[in-house]
Regions:
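Bacterial N-terminal signal peptides that target proteins for export
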Residues: 1-10
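Bacterial N-terminal signal peptides
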Residues: 9-19
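Extracellular-facing/secreted segment signature in eukaryotic proteins
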Residues: 22-184
Length: 184
């Protein structure tokens, strides 16, 4: 009798653990917006933003938050997958049409790579970042207000030096999922 109870408990615990692990691995996001051949999914977890970005490219995918003019003052994260290994960079829009590594400007890298894949001509990058870091090159993001989000992807080349093949700007409320295209 005790053996059956112990086996039943082990089965229940294993099922619960498998359910939890599969939920974590699927990395469900609360919201997602799509723009042409690109998507941006996100979830706010405390003071952290979890992001998933995908595009129909075998090159880089990127996102920027809250520019003041074109790309200026935006916090950018770009990523690609090469030979199965994902890589990201954290940059700051230091000019209307240019962004530079936070580290090179004297800041810190505050985006943390979660993972990335390149399958069927689609590159997907997942990362987390603080909503408010101590880095002056990472402007705070207010999840309750409107956030301007820049989405872009590059040509089929694993290099952060190539110019975007596609780009767009969206106005997003990160706490409700409401979004609309920004008129240019």
């Amino acid at each position: 009798m005790k053996t059956r109870i112990i086996i039943s408990l082990i089965v229940v615990v294993c099922v619960a653990l498998l359910s939890t692990v599969s939920g974590v691995n699927s990395a469900e996001y609360d919201y997602e917006v799509k723009a042409k051949k690109m998507s941006f999914g996100w979830k706010v977890v405390g003071d952290t933003l979890a992001v998933k970005m995908s595009a129909k490219t075998e090159g880089w995918v990127g996102i920027g938050f809250n520019p003041s003019k074109k790309m200026k003052d935006a916090n950018f994260v770009l990523g690609y997958v090469k030979k199965g290994e994902a890589k990201i960079i954290d940059e700051f829009g230091n000019e209307p049409t240019k962004h530079t590594s936070d580290k090179k400007l004297g800041g810190t890298v505050d985006a943390t790579l979660v993972g990335g894949t390149e399958e069927g001509g689609i590159t997907t990058i997942e990362f987390t970042m603080p909503l408010k870091s101590a880095d002056k090159y990472d402007p705070a993001i207010d999840v309750n207000g409107e956030t301007i989000v820049l989405l872009a992807y590059g040509p089929s080349r694993d290099s952060f030096k190539t110019k975007h093949k596609y780009r767009t700007a969206l106005k997003v409320n990160l706490s409700t999922g409401a979004s609309e295209a920004v008129k240019k």
